């Protein structure tokens, strides 16, 4: 299974070995106590935290010294040896954000943990290269990791993918905008929309409205078309986060349901009712034909 990291341990270790041979990675024997002491000193001196520069005490350990420690059974991890300088800047084009500028990465981050498995950063580079990934779409909280990932890809000799960093969906919380939270907000869970009786198709269409402002106009002109035919364009996505709008979502939901045939409305309603409204489920099952008539030709008030 190419997606199961534990089954790909040998692959990651082979690439880590390559970096070590190239002088771009090294075994680090720093103990938790040493790292904690380092953090305290950095905090006291009010300088950037991390394992870099003079703080990277095992960075220049000789091959003989490292081999001796490994042979003695000392636990270790493997760190990437950065050649960056925090005082230098790099310029990068993000598909969504446009041109962005960062300090170079100078952190000797962990690439192989003590259990032999990779960190996210290393797995991202190795897996995406082997799976021929051309575009990486992820949350903008990862934007600051771009300098590290660019350096890592180049050190491995890999083609760098195009990055597209999406902004989070926001919520109005008593007049203040904040990111929708998995801990605080039920709207962050897919199950919430199912419980509310909102079809998955409606949620997808609403998200397309947020993703590309021209989707709404496309939908008006192509009412019978499957949304899959809409061409989502990353460079037209909003740079800032969109505000979650339940009224708009319900409006989209009504429009989506209106395109369902009566049989689909009935079957989807029954599935929902069997889980969330037993009384309604019994009514629907009692007379399917009558239910279909009501769905197809809703009673009109005079």
Which residues fall in each region the model found?
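Residue patterns forming the tRNA-binding/recognition surfaces of aminoacyl-tRNA synthetases
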Residues: 13, 22-24, 209
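Hydrophobic (often cysteine-bearing) scaffold residues that line and stabilize catalytic clefts
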Residues: 8, 12, 145, 199
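Active-site cores that bind ATP or allylic diphosphates and position pyrophosphate for catalysis
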Residues: 5, 18-21, 25-165, 170-180, ...
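Catalytic adenosine-cofactor/nucleotide-binding cores of aminoacyl-tRNA synthetases and other
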Residues: 156-292, 296, 300
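Aromatic/His-enriched, Gly/Pro-containing loop or helix-boundary segments
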Residues: 1-15
């Amino acid at each position: 299974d190419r997606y199961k990291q534990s089954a790909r341990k040998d692959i990651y270790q082979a690439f880590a070995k390559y970096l070590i041979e190239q002088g771009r990675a090294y075994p680090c024997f720093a103990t938790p106590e040493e790292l904690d002491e380092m953090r305290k000193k950095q905090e006291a001196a009010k300088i950037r935290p991390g394992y870099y520069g003079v703080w990277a005490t095992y960075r220049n350990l000789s091959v003989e010294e490292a081999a001796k420690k490994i042979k003695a059974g000392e636990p270790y991890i493997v760190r990437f040896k950065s050649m960056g300088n925090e005082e230098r800047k790099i310029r990068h084009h993000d598909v969504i954000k446009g041109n962005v500028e960062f300090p170079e990465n100078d952190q000797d981050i962990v690439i192989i943990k003590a259990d032999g498995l990779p960190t996210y950063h290393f797995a991202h580079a190795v897996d995406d290269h082997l799976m021929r990934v051309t575009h990486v779409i992820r949350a903008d909280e990862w934007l600051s990791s771009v300098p590290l990932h660019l350096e890592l890809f180049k050190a491995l000799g890999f083609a760098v993918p195009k990055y597209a960093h999406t902004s989070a969906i926001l919520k109005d919380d008593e007049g203040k905008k904040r990111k929708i939270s998995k801990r605080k907000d039920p709207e962050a869970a897919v199950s919430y929309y199912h419980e509310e009786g909102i079809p998955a198709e409606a949620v997808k269409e609403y998200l397309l409205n947020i993703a590309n402002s021209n989707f709404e106009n496309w939908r008006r002109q192509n009412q019978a078309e499957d949304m899959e035919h809409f061409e989502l364009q990353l460079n037209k996505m909003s740079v800032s986060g969109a505000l979650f709008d339940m009224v708009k979502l319900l409006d989209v939901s009504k429009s989506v349901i209106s395109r369902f045939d009566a049989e689909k409305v009935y079957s989807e309603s029954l599935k929902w009712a069997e889980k969330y409204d037993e009384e309604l489920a019994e009514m629907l099952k009692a007379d399917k034909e009558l239910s279909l008539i009501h769905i197809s030709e809703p009673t009109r008030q005079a």
